Protein backbone atom coordinates (compact mmCIF):
# COMPACT_ATOMS: atom_id res chain seq x y z
CA UNK A 1 0.00 0.00 0.00
CA UNK A 2 1.69 3.17 -1.20
CA UNK A 3 1.16 6.85 -0.49
CA UNK A 4 0.54 7.40 -4.21
CA UNK A 5 -2.28 4.87 -4.07
CA UNK A 6 -3.95 6.58 -1.13
CA UNK A 7 -3.57 9.98 -2.80
CA UNK A 8 -5.30 8.59 -5.90
CA UNK A 9 -8.19 7.31 -3.78
CA UNK A 10 -8.41 10.61 -1.89
CA UNK A 11 -8.41 12.77 -5.03
CA UNK A 12 -11.03 10.53 -6.59
CA UNK A 13 -13.36 10.95 -3.62
CA UNK A 14 -12.83 14.72 -3.49
CA UNK A 15 -13.72 14.99 -7.19
CA UNK A 16 -16.93 13.02 -6.62
CA UNK A 17 -17.73 15.20 -3.60
CA UNK A 18 -17.14 18.38 -5.62
CA UNK A 19 -19.53 17.22 -8.35
CA UNK A 20 -22.32 16.10 -6.02
CA UNK A 21 -24.00 19.42 -5.24
CA UNK A 22 -23.79 21.17 -8.65
CA UNK A 23 -24.87 18.05 -10.49
CA UNK A 24 -27.66 17.53 -7.96
CA UNK A 25 -28.94 21.06 -8.57
CA UNK A 26 -28.92 20.51 -12.32
CA UNK A 27 -30.75 17.18 -11.99
CA UNK A 28 -33.46 18.80 -9.85
CA UNK A 29 -34.00 21.47 -12.51
CA UNK A 30 -34.27 18.82 -15.21
CA UNK A 31 -36.63 16.50 -13.30
CA UNK A 32 -38.90 19.35 -12.22
CA UNK A 33 -39.09 20.75 -15.74
CA UNK A 34 -37.37 24.04 -15.00
CA UNK A 35 -35.50 25.98 -17.65
CA UNK A 36 -31.80 25.11 -17.95
CA UNK A 37 -28.99 26.34 -20.18
CA UNK A 38 -29.82 23.45 -22.54
CA UNK A 39 -33.51 24.33 -22.84
CA UNK A 40 -33.17 26.63 -25.91
CA UNK A 41 -31.57 23.77 -27.84
CA UNK A 42 -33.29 20.69 -26.43
CA UNK A 43 -36.67 22.13 -25.42
CA UNK A 44 -38.08 21.95 -28.99
CA UNK A 45 -36.76 18.38 -29.32
CA UNK A 46 -38.44 17.38 -26.05
CA UNK A 47 -41.78 18.88 -27.09
CA UNK A 48 -41.55 17.24 -30.53
CA UNK A 49 -40.99 13.84 -28.92
CA UNK A 50 -44.10 14.28 -26.77
CA UNK A 51 -46.22 15.28 -29.78
CA UNK A 52 -44.92 12.41 -31.88
CA UNK A 53 -45.52 9.80 -29.17
CA UNK A 54 -48.81 11.20 -27.90
CA UNK A 55 -47.50 11.86 -24.39
CA UNK A 56 -49.13 14.63 -22.38
CA UNK A 57 -46.37 15.90 -20.10
CA UNK A 58 -48.78 17.67 -17.77
CA UNK A 59 -50.58 14.42 -16.93
CA UNK A 60 -49.02 12.56 -14.03
CA UNK A 61 -49.42 8.89 -13.15
CA UNK A 62 -50.23 6.85 -10.09
CA UNK A 63 -47.57 4.39 -8.95
CA UNK A 64 -49.31 1.48 -10.68
CA UNK A 65 -49.57 3.32 -14.01
CA UNK A 66 -45.97 4.47 -13.64
CA UNK A 67 -44.84 0.87 -13.11
CA UNK A 68 -46.99 -0.37 -15.99
CA UNK A 69 -45.49 2.21 -18.35
CA UNK A 70 -41.98 1.19 -17.32
CA UNK A 71 -42.63 -2.54 -17.70
CA UNK A 72 -44.35 -2.06 -21.07
CA UNK A 73 -41.41 -0.04 -22.34
CA UNK A 74 -38.97 -2.70 -21.16
CA UNK A 75 -40.89 -5.43 -22.99
CA UNK A 76 -40.70 -3.44 -26.23
CA UNK A 77 -36.97 -2.85 -25.67
CA UNK A 78 -36.36 -6.56 -25.08
CA UNK A 79 -38.16 -7.56 -28.28
CA UNK A 80 -36.27 -4.93 -30.30
CA UNK A 81 -32.82 -5.95 -29.04
CA UNK A 82 -33.57 -9.66 -29.41
CA UNK A 83 -34.72 -9.12 -33.00
CA UNK A 84 -31.60 -7.11 -33.90
CA UNK A 85 -29.30 -9.79 -32.52
CA UNK A 86 -31.15 -12.67 -34.18
CA UNK A 87 -31.16 -10.86 -37.55
CA UNK A 88 -27.62 -9.51 -37.24
CA UNK A 89 -26.24 -11.46 -40.22
CA UNK A 90 -28.75 -9.77 -42.55
CA UNK A 91 -28.34 -6.20 -41.27
CA UNK A 92 -25.86 -3.52 -42.40
CA UNK A 93 -22.77 -2.16 -40.60
CA UNK A 94 -21.27 -5.60 -40.21
CA UNK A 95 -17.78 -5.33 -41.78
CA UNK A 96 -16.51 -8.44 -39.98
CA UNK A 97 -19.42 -10.52 -41.28
CA UNK A 98 -20.61 -11.59 -37.83
CA UNK A 99 -23.34 -14.23 -37.91
CA UNK A 100 -26.68 -14.03 -36.15
CA UNK A 101 -26.56 -14.52 -32.39
CA UNK A 102 -27.79 -17.86 -30.99
CA UNK A 103 -31.27 -17.79 -29.40
CA UNK A 104 -30.15 -18.36 -25.78
CA UNK A 105 -27.33 -15.82 -26.08
CA UNK A 106 -29.60 -13.26 -27.77
CA UNK A 107 -32.13 -13.71 -24.94
CA UNK A 108 -29.44 -13.34 -22.28
CA UNK A 109 -27.93 -10.26 -23.93
CA UNK A 110 -31.29 -8.56 -24.50
CA UNK A 111 -32.33 -9.08 -20.88
CA UNK A 112 -28.90 -7.99 -19.71
CA UNK A 113 -28.89 -4.63 -21.47
CA UNK A 114 -32.59 -3.90 -20.90
CA UNK A 115 -32.12 -4.37 -17.14
CA UNK A 116 -28.94 -2.23 -17.03
CA UNK A 117 -26.93 -5.32 -16.05
CA UNK A 118 -24.73 -5.67 -19.14
CA UNK A 119 -23.65 -9.19 -18.28
CA UNK A 120 -21.79 -10.43 -21.36
CA UNK A 121 -21.64 -14.12 -22.21
CA UNK A 122 -19.80 -13.19 -25.42
CA UNK A 123 -16.75 -11.33 -26.67
CA UNK A 124 -17.91 -8.07 -28.21
CA UNK A 125 -15.36 -7.88 -31.01
CA UNK A 126 -15.98 -11.49 -32.09
CA UNK A 127 -19.77 -11.63 -31.77
CA UNK A 128 -21.46 -8.27 -32.35
CA UNK A 129 -21.69 -6.13 -35.49
CA UNK A 130 -21.37 -2.37 -35.30
CA UNK A 131 -25.12 -2.00 -35.80
CA UNK A 132 -25.87 -4.37 -32.93
CA UNK A 133 -23.45 -2.49 -30.70
CA UNK A 134 -24.94 0.90 -31.55
CA UNK A 135 -28.64 0.43 -32.30
CA UNK A 136 -29.15 -2.51 -29.99
CA UNK A 137 -26.83 -2.19 -27.01
CA UNK A 138 -25.82 1.47 -26.80
CA UNK A 139 -29.42 2.66 -27.09
CA UNK A 140 -30.30 0.45 -24.13
CA UNK A 141 -27.37 1.90 -22.21
CA UNK A 142 -29.13 5.26 -22.46
CA UNK A 143 -32.73 4.28 -21.82
CA UNK A 144 -32.03 1.75 -19.06
CA UNK A 145 -30.03 4.38 -17.17
CA UNK A 146 -32.75 6.96 -17.80
CA UNK A 147 -35.33 4.54 -16.42
CA UNK A 148 -33.28 4.22 -13.24
CA UNK A 149 -33.17 8.00 -12.83
CA UNK A 150 -36.92 8.15 -13.47
CA UNK A 151 -37.69 5.57 -10.77
CA UNK A 152 -35.44 7.39 -8.29
CA UNK A 153 -37.25 10.65 -9.04
CA UNK A 154 -40.64 8.99 -8.57
CA UNK A 155 -39.64 7.60 -5.18
CA UNK A 156 -38.28 10.95 -4.02
CA UNK A 157 -41.58 12.57 -5.01
CA UNK A 158 -43.36 9.98 -2.90
CA UNK A 159 -41.63 11.34 0.20
CA UNK A 160 -41.74 14.99 -0.88
CA UNK A 161 -45.47 15.19 -1.70
CA UNK A 162 -48.40 15.06 0.65
CA UNK A 163 -51.88 13.60 0.04
CA UNK A 164 -51.14 13.04 -3.65
CA UNK A 165 -52.10 10.12 -5.87
CA UNK A 166 -49.43 10.86 -8.48
CA UNK A 167 -45.66 10.37 -8.43
CA UNK A 168 -44.80 11.81 -11.85
CA UNK A 169 -44.92 10.73 -15.48
CA UNK A 170 -42.55 7.93 -16.49
CA UNK A 171 -42.29 9.02 -20.13
CA UNK A 172 -41.49 12.61 -19.19
CA UNK A 173 -38.91 11.61 -16.58
CA UNK A 174 -37.18 9.23 -18.98
CA UNK A 175 -37.11 11.69 -21.89
CA UNK A 176 -35.74 14.50 -19.72
CA UNK A 177 -33.09 12.28 -18.13
CA UNK A 178 -31.94 11.14 -21.57
CA UNK A 179 -32.07 14.48 -23.38
CA UNK A 180 -30.74 16.86 -20.74
CA UNK A 181 -28.42 14.64 -18.68
CA UNK A 182 -27.17 11.48 -20.36
CA UNK A 183 -26.81 12.63 -23.97
CA UNK A 184 -24.98 15.96 -23.39
CA UNK A 185 -22.52 14.54 -20.86
CA UNK A 186 -21.92 11.50 -23.07
CA UNK A 187 -21.10 13.73 -26.05
CA UNK A 188 -18.48 15.58 -24.00
CA UNK A 189 -17.02 12.34 -22.65
CA UNK A 190 -16.95 10.78 -26.14
CA UNK A 191 -14.94 13.70 -27.53
CA UNK A 192 -12.53 13.47 -24.60
CA UNK A 193 -12.07 9.73 -25.16
CA UNK A 194 -11.39 10.24 -28.87
CA UNK A 195 -8.79 12.86 -27.94
CA UNK A 196 -7.20 10.30 -25.61
CA UNK A 197 -6.95 7.74 -28.41
CA UNK A 198 -10.08 5.60 -28.10
CA UNK A 199 -11.29 4.61 -31.61
CA UNK A 200 -14.51 5.96 -33.12
CA UNK A 201 -14.79 4.57 -36.62
CA UNK A 202 -16.95 2.45 -38.91
CA UNK A 203 -13.87 0.96 -40.57
CA UNK A 204 -13.31 -2.76 -40.28
CA UNK A 205 -10.54 -4.55 -38.42
CA UNK A 206 -6.90 -3.84 -39.26
CA UNK A 207 -4.38 -6.62 -39.89
CA UNK A 208 -0.95 -5.79 -38.48
CA UNK A 209 2.36 -7.65 -38.61
CA UNK A 210 4.07 -8.06 -35.24
CA UNK A 211 7.83 -7.99 -34.60
CA UNK A 212 7.77 -11.79 -34.70
CA UNK A 213 6.32 -11.68 -38.21
CA UNK A 214 2.92 -12.94 -37.09
CA UNK A 215 -0.25 -11.39 -38.54
CA UNK A 216 -2.59 -10.02 -35.90
CA UNK A 217 -6.15 -8.78 -36.42
CA UNK A 218 -6.84 -5.58 -34.46
CA UNK A 219 -10.54 -4.93 -33.94
CA UNK A 220 -11.84 -1.37 -34.23
CA UNK A 221 -15.27 0.23 -34.19
CA UNK A 222 -17.38 3.06 -32.73
CA UNK A 223 -15.91 2.53 -29.27
CA UNK A 224 -15.69 6.03 -27.74
CA UNK A 225 -19.42 6.77 -27.98
CA UNK A 226 -20.30 3.49 -26.29
CA UNK A 227 -17.59 3.89 -23.66
CA UNK A 228 -19.02 7.22 -22.53
CA UNK A 229 -22.55 6.01 -21.72
CA UNK A 230 -21.25 2.63 -20.59
CA UNK A 231 -19.65 4.39 -17.61
CA UNK A 232 -21.96 7.35 -17.10
CA UNK A 233 -25.06 5.14 -17.07
CA UNK A 234 -23.38 2.51 -14.86
CA UNK A 235 -23.99 -0.03 -17.60
CA UNK A 236 -20.58 -1.67 -17.86
CA UNK A 237 -20.84 -3.76 -21.02
CA UNK A 238 -17.60 -3.47 -22.97
CA UNK A 239 -17.11 -3.11 -26.70
CA UNK A 240 -14.21 -5.55 -26.32
CA UNK A 241 -14.07 -8.81 -24.41
CA UNK A 242 -11.65 -7.59 -21.72
CA UNK A 243 -13.69 -4.43 -21.17
CA UNK A 244 -11.81 -1.44 -19.73
CA UNK A 245 -8.60 -3.45 -19.43
CA UNK A 246 -8.37 -3.09 -23.25
CA UNK A 247 -6.20 -0.14 -24.34
CA UNK A 248 -8.84 0.85 -26.92
CA UNK A 249 -11.39 1.30 -24.13
CA UNK A 250 -9.12 2.67 -21.41
CA UNK A 251 -5.71 3.68 -22.76
CA UNK A 252 -4.10 5.45 -19.80
CA UNK A 253 -4.35 6.57 -16.18
CA UNK A 254 -6.29 9.72 -17.10
CA UNK A 255 -9.07 7.90 -18.94
CA UNK A 256 -9.15 5.38 -16.09
CA UNK A 257 -9.70 8.19 -13.58
CA UNK A 258 -12.38 9.89 -15.69
CA UNK A 259 -14.19 6.58 -16.19
CA UNK A 260 -14.34 6.02 -12.42
CA UNK A 261 -15.64 9.55 -11.86
CA UNK A 262 -18.28 8.93 -14.53
CA UNK A 263 -19.49 5.81 -12.73
CA UNK A 264 -20.13 7.65 -9.45
CA UNK A 265 -21.16 11.09 -10.74
CA UNK A 266 -24.92 10.76 -11.26
CA UNK A 267 -25.43 8.37 -8.34
CA UNK A 268 -23.74 10.85 -6.01
CA UNK A 269 -25.69 13.74 -7.53
CA UNK A 270 -28.99 11.96 -6.89
CA UNK A 271 -28.31 11.96 -3.14
CA UNK A 272 -28.32 15.75 -3.36
CA UNK A 273 -31.49 15.63 -5.47
CA UNK A 274 -33.08 13.66 -2.65
CA UNK A 275 -32.23 16.32 -0.08
CA UNK A 276 -33.33 19.23 -2.26
CA UNK A 277 -36.66 17.71 -3.30
CA UNK A 278 -37.70 16.70 0.24
CA UNK A 279 -36.90 20.22 1.41
CA UNK A 280 -33.90 19.44 3.62
CA UNK A 281 -30.54 19.19 1.92
CA UNK A 282 -29.03 17.70 5.08
CA UNK A 283 -31.04 14.54 4.40
CA UNK A 284 -29.18 14.12 1.14
CA UNK A 285 -25.81 14.64 2.77
CA UNK A 286 -26.70 12.06 5.44
CA UNK A 287 -27.37 9.52 2.69
CA UNK A 288 -24.13 10.46 0.92
CA UNK A 289 -22.18 10.19 4.19
CA UNK A 290 -23.48 6.70 4.97
CA UNK A 291 -22.59 5.59 1.45
CA UNK A 292 -19.13 7.15 1.77
CA UNK A 293 -18.35 5.32 5.02
CA UNK A 294 -19.15 1.98 3.41
CA UNK A 295 -17.18 2.95 0.29
CA UNK A 296 -13.99 3.64 2.25
CA UNK A 297 -14.31 0.41 4.22
CA UNK A 298 -14.58 -1.57 0.98
CA UNK A 299 -11.84 0.16 -0.99
CA UNK A 300 -9.45 -0.08 1.97
CA UNK A 301 -10.10 -3.81 2.29
CA UNK A 302 -9.59 -4.64 -1.38
CA UNK A 303 -6.50 -2.40 -1.65
CA UNK A 304 -4.97 -3.99 1.45
CA UNK A 305 -5.63 -7.52 0.18
CA UNK A 306 -4.16 -6.92 -3.28
CA UNK A 307 -1.21 -4.80 -2.16
CA UNK A 308 0.15 -7.53 0.11
CA UNK A 309 0.54 -10.01 -2.73
CA UNK A 310 0.14 -13.76 -2.76
CA UNK A 311 1.74 -15.41 0.30
CA UNK A 312 2.14 -18.65 -1.65
CA UNK A 313 4.43 -16.82 -4.09
CA UNK A 314 6.41 -15.21 -1.29
CA UNK A 315 7.28 -18.68 -0.01
CA UNK A 316 9.18 -19.25 -3.29
CA UNK A 317 11.11 -16.01 -2.94
CA UNK A 318 9.14 -14.21 -5.66
CA UNK A 319 9.21 -10.44 -5.28
CA UNK A 320 5.79 -9.19 -4.14
CA UNK A 321 6.68 -5.52 -3.71
CA UNK A 322 4.19 -4.47 -6.40
CA UNK A 323 1.41 -6.53 -4.83
CA UNK A 324 -0.71 -9.09 -6.65
CA UNK A 325 -0.27 -8.10 -10.30
CA UNK A 326 -1.91 -11.20 -11.78
CA UNK A 327 -4.75 -10.13 -14.08
CA UNK A 328 -3.89 -6.44 -13.77
CA UNK A 329 -2.60 -3.93 -16.30
CA UNK A 330 0.83 -2.48 -15.56
CA UNK A 331 -0.38 0.94 -16.76
CA UNK A 332 -2.79 1.02 -13.80
CA UNK A 333 -1.14 -1.01 -11.05
CA UNK A 334 -2.67 -2.39 -7.87
CA UNK A 335 -4.10 0.83 -6.39
CA UNK A 336 -6.03 1.96 -9.47
CA UNK A 337 -7.21 -1.60 -10.14
CA UNK A 338 -8.43 -2.04 -6.56
CA UNK A 339 -10.19 1.33 -6.62
CA UNK A 340 -11.82 0.53 -9.95
CA UNK A 341 -13.03 -2.84 -8.62
CA UNK A 342 -14.59 -1.17 -5.58
CA UNK A 343 -16.21 1.60 -7.63
CA UNK A 344 -17.64 -0.66 -10.32
CA UNK A 345 -19.28 -2.97 -7.75
CA UNK A 346 -20.38 -0.20 -5.39
CA UNK A 347 -22.27 1.09 -8.38
CA UNK A 348 -24.10 -1.41 -10.55
CA UNK A 349 -21.63 -0.81 -13.37
CA UNK A 350 -19.70 -4.03 -13.84
CA UNK A 351 -16.99 -2.60 -16.08
CA UNK A 352 -13.53 -3.88 -15.15
CA UNK A 353 -9.97 -2.74 -15.74
CA UNK A 354 -8.56 -5.92 -14.17
CA UNK A 355 -9.71 -9.52 -13.96
CA UNK A 356 -11.62 -9.98 -10.70
CA UNK A 357 -11.08 -13.73 -10.84
CA UNK A 358 -7.33 -13.12 -10.51
CA UNK A 359 -7.76 -11.10 -7.33
CA UNK A 360 -6.70 -12.84 -4.14
CA UNK A 361 -9.57 -14.50 -2.24
CA UNK A 362 -10.16 -11.61 0.18
CA UNK A 363 -9.63 -9.04 -2.58
CA UNK A 364 -12.22 -10.76 -4.76
CA UNK A 365 -14.59 -11.08 -1.82
CA UNK A 366 -14.96 -7.30 -1.48
CA UNK A 367 -16.56 -6.74 -4.92
CA UNK A 368 -18.75 -9.76 -4.18
CA UNK A 369 -19.92 -8.27 -0.86
CA UNK A 370 -20.53 -4.89 -2.50
CA UNK A 371 -23.01 -6.55 -4.85
CA UNK A 372 -24.56 -8.68 -2.11
CA UNK A 373 -25.37 -5.53 -0.14
CA UNK A 374 -27.57 -4.46 -3.04
CA UNK A 375 -25.08 -1.97 -4.50
CA UNK A 376 -26.41 0.83 -2.31
CA UNK A 377 -22.97 2.45 -1.91
CA UNK A 378 -23.62 5.28 -4.41
CA UNK A 379 -25.07 2.48 -6.52
CA UNK A 380 -26.28 2.38 -10.07
CA UNK A 381 -27.85 5.42 -11.73
CA UNK A 382 -31.06 5.78 -9.70
CA UNK A 383 -30.94 2.21 -8.42
CA UNK A 384 -28.43 3.02 -5.69
CA UNK A 385 -30.63 5.72 -4.18
CA UNK A 386 -33.88 3.79 -4.11
CA UNK A 387 -32.02 0.73 -2.84
CA UNK A 388 -30.57 2.81 -0.02
CA UNK A 389 -34.00 4.23 0.83
CA UNK A 390 -35.29 0.68 1.31
CA UNK A 391 -32.61 0.06 3.94
CA UNK A 392 -33.33 3.48 5.48
CA UNK A 393 -36.96 2.43 5.93
CA UNK A 394 -35.82 -0.74 7.73
CA UNK A 395 -33.49 1.36 9.91
CA UNK A 396 -36.18 3.81 11.05
CA UNK A 397 -38.58 0.89 11.56
CA UNK A 398 -36.05 -0.74 13.90
CA UNK A 399 -35.47 2.57 15.68
CA UNK A 400 -39.23 2.96 16.14
CA UNK A 401 -39.50 -0.51 17.64
CA UNK A 402 -36.72 0.26 20.11
CA UNK A 403 -38.45 3.37 21.48
CA UNK A 404 -41.99 2.02 21.19
CA UNK A 405 -43.40 4.50 18.68
CA UNK A 406 -44.65 4.40 15.11
CA UNK A 407 -41.59 4.85 12.86
CA UNK A 408 -41.43 7.91 10.62
CA UNK A 409 -39.18 8.88 7.76
CA UNK A 410 -39.19 12.46 6.50
CA UNK A 411 -42.47 13.09 8.31
CA UNK A 412 -44.23 10.09 6.77
CA UNK A 413 -45.36 7.19 8.96
CA UNK A 414 -43.87 3.82 8.06
CA UNK A 415 -46.66 1.26 8.35
CA UNK A 416 -47.24 -2.42 7.56
CA UNK A 417 -47.67 -1.93 3.79
CA UNK A 418 -44.34 -0.15 3.42
CA UNK A 419 -42.50 -2.76 5.48
CA UNK A 420 -44.00 -5.62 3.44
CA UNK A 421 -42.98 -3.99 0.16
CA UNK A 422 -39.52 -3.21 1.52
CA UNK A 423 -38.89 -6.78 2.64
CA UNK A 424 -40.14 -8.14 -0.70
CA UNK A 425 -37.58 -5.99 -2.49
CA UNK A 426 -34.75 -6.73 -0.05
CA UNK A 427 -35.29 -10.51 0.18
CA UNK A 428 -35.64 -11.23 -3.54
CA UNK A 429 -31.92 -10.61 -4.08
CA UNK A 430 -30.51 -13.25 -1.69
CA UNK A 431 -33.18 -15.66 -2.92
CA UNK A 432 -31.81 -15.42 -6.45
CA UNK A 433 -28.14 -15.16 -5.52
CA UNK A 434 -28.09 -18.11 -3.14
CA UNK A 435 -30.88 -20.23 -4.61
CA UNK A 436 -29.59 -20.26 -8.17
CA UNK A 437 -26.02 -20.84 -6.97
CA UNK A 438 -27.11 -23.83 -4.89
CA UNK A 439 -28.76 -25.43 -7.91
CA UNK A 440 -25.91 -24.61 -10.32
CA UNK A 441 -23.25 -26.36 -8.22
CA UNK A 442 -25.15 -29.67 -8.14
CA UNK A 443 -26.46 -30.00 -11.72
CA UNK A 444 -24.29 -31.04 -14.67
CA UNK A 445 -24.94 -28.02 -16.93
CA UNK A 446 -24.06 -25.73 -14.04
CA UNK A 447 -20.83 -27.51 -13.15
CA UNK A 448 -19.80 -27.81 -16.81
CA UNK A 449 -19.31 -24.05 -17.08
CA UNK A 450 -16.91 -23.72 -14.15
CA UNK A 451 -13.18 -23.57 -14.91
CA UNK A 452 -12.07 -24.10 -11.31
CA UNK A 453 -12.76 -26.64 -8.60
CA UNK A 454 -13.11 -26.36 -4.84
CA UNK A 455 -13.98 -23.07 -3.14
CA UNK A 456 -12.84 -21.01 -6.13
CA UNK A 457 -15.24 -22.83 -8.44
CA UNK A 458 -18.04 -22.22 -5.95
CA UNK A 459 -17.13 -18.53 -5.88
CA UNK A 460 -17.30 -18.40 -9.70
CA UNK A 461 -20.91 -19.57 -9.56
CA UNK A 462 -21.82 -17.37 -6.59
CA UNK A 463 -20.25 -14.31 -8.22
CA UNK A 464 -22.16 -14.89 -11.47
CA UNK A 465 -25.62 -15.07 -9.90
CA UNK A 466 -24.82 -12.27 -7.47
CA UNK A 467 -23.73 -10.07 -10.36
CA UNK A 468 -26.87 -10.92 -12.33
CA UNK A 469 -29.33 -10.31 -9.49
CA UNK A 470 -27.57 -7.10 -8.46
CA UNK A 471 -27.66 -5.92 -12.11
CA UNK A 472 -23.90 -5.44 -12.04
CA UNK A 473 -22.61 -7.53 -14.93
CA UNK A 474 -19.01 -8.15 -13.88
CA UNK A 475 -17.84 -11.74 -13.68
CA UNK A 476 -15.18 -14.18 -12.63
CA UNK A 477 -14.16 -14.66 -16.24
CA UNK A 478 -13.28 -18.33 -15.87
CA UNK A 479 -16.97 -19.16 -16.09
CA UNK A 480 -17.94 -20.21 -19.62
CA UNK A 481 -21.64 -19.52 -20.05
CA UNK A 482 -23.70 -22.26 -21.74
CA UNK A 483 -27.46 -22.25 -22.49
CA UNK A 484 -28.26 -23.25 -18.89
CA UNK A 485 -26.34 -20.29 -17.52
CA UNK A 486 -27.65 -17.89 -20.16
CA UNK A 487 -31.26 -18.73 -19.31
CA UNK A 488 -30.93 -18.80 -15.52
CA UNK A 489 -28.80 -15.66 -15.41
CA UNK A 490 -31.42 -13.90 -17.54
CA UNK A 491 -34.13 -14.88 -15.05
CA UNK A 492 -31.95 -13.64 -12.21
CA UNK A 493 -31.42 -10.28 -13.92
CA UNK A 494 -35.15 -9.71 -14.41
CA UNK A 495 -35.99 -10.62 -10.81
CA UNK A 496 -33.17 -8.44 -9.49
CA UNK A 497 -34.35 -5.43 -11.49
CA UNK A 498 -38.12 -5.51 -11.50
CA UNK A 499 -38.83 -7.23 -8.16
CA UNK A 500 -37.07 -4.25 -6.59
CA UNK A 501 -38.42 -1.47 -8.79
CA UNK A 502 -42.12 -2.38 -8.54
CA UNK A 503 -42.21 -2.64 -4.70
CA UNK A 504 -40.18 0.58 -4.50
CA UNK A 505 -42.74 2.36 -6.69
CA UNK A 506 -45.54 0.92 -4.55
CA UNK A 507 -43.86 2.45 -1.50
CA UNK A 508 -43.59 5.77 -3.34
CA UNK A 509 -47.31 5.73 -4.14
CA UNK A 510 -48.19 4.87 -0.55
CA UNK A 511 -45.97 7.59 0.89
CA UNK A 512 -47.20 10.25 -1.54
CA UNK A 513 -50.77 9.72 -0.34
CA UNK A 514 -49.87 10.34 3.32
CA UNK A 515 -49.85 13.51 5.34
CA UNK A 516 -46.61 14.88 6.70
CA UNK A 517 -46.48 14.53 10.48
CA UNK A 518 -44.83 17.51 12.24
CA UNK A 519 -41.63 16.49 14.08
CA UNK A 520 -41.83 16.10 17.84
CA UNK A 521 -39.43 15.40 20.69
CA UNK A 522 -39.82 11.67 20.04
CA UNK A 523 -39.05 11.86 16.31
CA UNK A 524 -35.89 10.02 15.28
CA UNK A 525 -33.69 12.52 13.38
CA UNK A 526 -32.55 11.17 10.03
CA UNK A 527 -29.88 13.74 9.23
CA UNK A 528 -27.44 12.98 12.05
CA UNK A 529 -24.45 10.74 12.64
CA UNK A 530 -26.62 8.34 14.64
CA UNK A 531 -28.84 7.74 11.61
CA UNK A 532 -25.80 7.33 9.36
CA UNK A 533 -24.38 4.69 11.70
CA UNK A 534 -27.73 2.92 12.07
CA UNK A 535 -28.34 2.65 8.33
CA UNK A 536 -24.78 1.48 7.69
CA UNK A 537 -25.24 -1.13 10.42
CA UNK A 538 -28.55 -2.31 8.97
CA UNK A 539 -27.01 -2.64 5.51
CA UNK A 540 -24.13 -4.72 6.88
CA UNK A 541 -26.26 -6.86 9.22
CA UNK A 542 -29.35 -7.41 7.08
CA UNK A 543 -27.43 -7.51 3.82
CA UNK A 544 -24.13 -9.01 4.91
CA UNK A 545 -24.99 -11.71 7.44
CA UNK A 546 -27.41 -13.30 5.00
CA UNK A 547 -24.47 -14.27 2.82
CA UNK A 548 -21.89 -15.18 5.48
CA UNK A 549 -22.33 -18.99 5.11
CA UNK A 550 -21.89 -18.74 1.34
CA UNK A 551 -18.82 -16.54 1.72
CA UNK A 552 -17.40 -19.03 4.21
CA UNK A 553 -17.72 -21.80 1.61
CA UNK A 554 -16.06 -19.70 -1.07
CA UNK A 555 -13.48 -16.93 -0.62
CA UNK A 556 -12.93 -17.38 3.13
CA UNK A 557 -12.08 -21.08 2.79
CA UNK A 558 -9.95 -20.31 -0.26
CA UNK A 559 -8.00 -17.69 1.70
CA UNK A 560 -7.32 -20.10 4.56
CA UNK A 561 -6.25 -22.76 2.05
CA UNK A 562 -3.92 -20.26 0.37
CA UNK A 563 -2.22 -19.55 3.70
CA UNK A 564 -1.44 -23.28 3.88
CA UNK A 565 -0.04 -23.29 0.35
CA UNK A 566 -3.04 -24.71 -1.54
CA UNK A 567 -4.10 -22.70 -4.59
CA UNK A 568 -7.12 -23.12 -6.88
From Swiss-Prot:
Matches recorded under Pfam families: KdpA
Q: Which InterPro entries match?
A: KdpA
Q: List membrane-spanning regions.
A: 7-27, 65-85, 136-156, 179-199, 254-274, 285-305, 332-352, 354-374, 377-397, 423-443, 487-507, 530-550
Task: Offer an example of a GO molecular function term for this protein.
Answer: P-type potassium transmembrane transporter activity
Q: Which UniProt keywords apply?
A: Cell inner membrane, Cell membrane, Ion transport, Membrane, Potassium, Potassium transport, Transmembrane, Transmembrane helix, Transport
The record's Gene Ontology cellular component field reads:
plasma membrane
Its membrane topology is listed as: Multi-pass membrane protein
Q: Where in the cell is it found?
A: Cell inner membrane
Keyword Transmembrane helix carried by entry: yes
> Known PANTHER family for this protein?
POTASSIUM-TRANSPORTING ATPASE A CHAIN, POTASSIUM-TRANSPORTING ATPASE POTASSIUM-BINDING SUBUNIT
Please name the HAMAP family in this protein's record: KdpA
Report the sequence similarity comment from the record: Belongs to the KdpA family.
State its role.
Part of the high-affinity ATP-driven potassium transport (or Kdp) system, which catalyzes the hydrolysis of ATP coupled with the electrogenic transport of potassium into the cytoplasm. This subunit binds the periplasmic potassium ions and delivers the ions to the membrane domain of KdpB through an intramembrane tunnel.
Q: How does it assemble?
A: The system is composed of three essential subunits: KdpA, KdpB and KdpC.
Mind telling me what this protein is named?
Potassium-transporting ATPase potassium-binding subunit
Amino acid sequence: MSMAGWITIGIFFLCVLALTRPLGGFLVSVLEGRRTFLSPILGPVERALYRFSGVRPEEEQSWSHYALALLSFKIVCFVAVYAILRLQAYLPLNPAGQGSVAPDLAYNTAVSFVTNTNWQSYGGETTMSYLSQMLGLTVQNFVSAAAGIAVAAAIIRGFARRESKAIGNFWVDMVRATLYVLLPISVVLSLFYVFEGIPQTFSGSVVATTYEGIHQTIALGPVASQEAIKMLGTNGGGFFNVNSAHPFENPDALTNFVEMISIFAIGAGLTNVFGRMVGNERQGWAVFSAMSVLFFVGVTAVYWAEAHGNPAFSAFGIDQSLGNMEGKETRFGVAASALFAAVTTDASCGAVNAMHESFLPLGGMVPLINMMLGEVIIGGVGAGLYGFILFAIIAVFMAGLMVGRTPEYLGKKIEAREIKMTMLAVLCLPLVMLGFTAVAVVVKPGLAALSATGPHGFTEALYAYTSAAANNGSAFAGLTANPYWNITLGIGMMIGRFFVIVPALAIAGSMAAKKIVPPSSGTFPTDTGLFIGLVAGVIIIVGGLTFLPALALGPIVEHLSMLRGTLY
